[in-house]
């Protein structure tokens, strides 16, 4: 019950052990303050220099969830992120982008999870070590591959001392959406929303969609923060059409 309330995970999801998403909002001091958080996943693949260049030019901060394998393969991208610590907070996305589900043969979106708790802990711990080695800062937040978790995984991650990073607006659906759809999703952003998008697929429409959508939010008076700057709370009024 407490885990469900803390993370806004459906009770039936915890009872059935099926993977669930964690939906969260920023804990704003005043509910209508136009503040939102942009989070970017760097799973595997490449480095979206166009997107990061836009964020630097516009001075828009973001929380980046990077895997060890992305860090190892994208020295240029890591160097750019590290050169702007005032904008980018780099957090743990795991070592090898293994979903946070436990049990032989368990999968999320066709990606195999962890056979046991020990493997999950290694995925989290080794990812954190890579982030700390690359940045000099120990991560506080963890977002699992696919952003879905089963109850055992959630408990294990939190027992390791990490905060589990959720979201309330899925901007690009794994960098698969077209520009206009991304813009439309960002148009739905409200005060306190946590946006999830991707920075590892430069061939996608994510950079163009985010650039247009984030500029529009700026015109509406929004400012952006990293997850280290503000507490989060369960998205109790989360609307399914917004993911």
Spans of model-derived segments:
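Active-site beta->alpha N-cap acidic-glycine motif
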Residues: 16-104, 108, 112-115, 126-133, ...
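Structural recognition of the beta-strand scaffold that forms the well-ordered cores
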Residues: 36-39, 62-66, 89-92, 140-143, ...
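Histidine/acidic-residue-rich catalytic or RNA/ligand-binding cores of hydrolases
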Residues: 100-108, 176-180, 206-211, 236-241
């Amino acid at each position: 019950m407490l885990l469900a309330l803390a993370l806004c995970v459906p009770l039936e999801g915890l009872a059935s052990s099926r993977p669930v998403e964690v939906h969260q909002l920023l804990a704003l001091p005043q509910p209508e303050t136009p503040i939102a958080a942009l989070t970017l996943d760097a799973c595997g693949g490449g480095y979206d220099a166009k997107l990061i260049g836009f964020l630097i030019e516009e001075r828009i901060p973001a929380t980046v969830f990077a895997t060890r394998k992305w860090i190892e393969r994208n020295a240029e991208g890591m160097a750019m992120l590290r050169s702007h610590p005032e904008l980018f907070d780099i957090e743990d996305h795991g070592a090898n982008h293994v979903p946070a589900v436990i049990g032989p043969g368990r999968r999320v979106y066709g990606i195999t999870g962890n056979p046991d708790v020990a493997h999950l802990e290694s995925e989290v711990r080794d990812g954190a070590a890579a982030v700390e080695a690359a940045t000099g800062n120990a991560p506080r937040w963890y977002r699992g591959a696919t952003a879905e978790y089963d109850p055992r995984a959630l408990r294990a991650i939190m027992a390791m001392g990490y905060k589990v990073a959720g979201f309330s607006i899925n901007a690009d659906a794994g960098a698969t959406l077209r520009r206009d759809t991304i813009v439309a999703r960002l148009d739905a952003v409200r005060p306190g929303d946590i946006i999830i998008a991707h920075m590892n697929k430069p061939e996608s429409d994510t950079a163009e969609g985010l650039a247009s959508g984030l500029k529009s939010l700026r015109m509406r008076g929004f400012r952006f923060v990293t997850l280290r700057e503000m507490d989060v709370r369960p998205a109790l009024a989360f609307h399914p059409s917004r993911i």
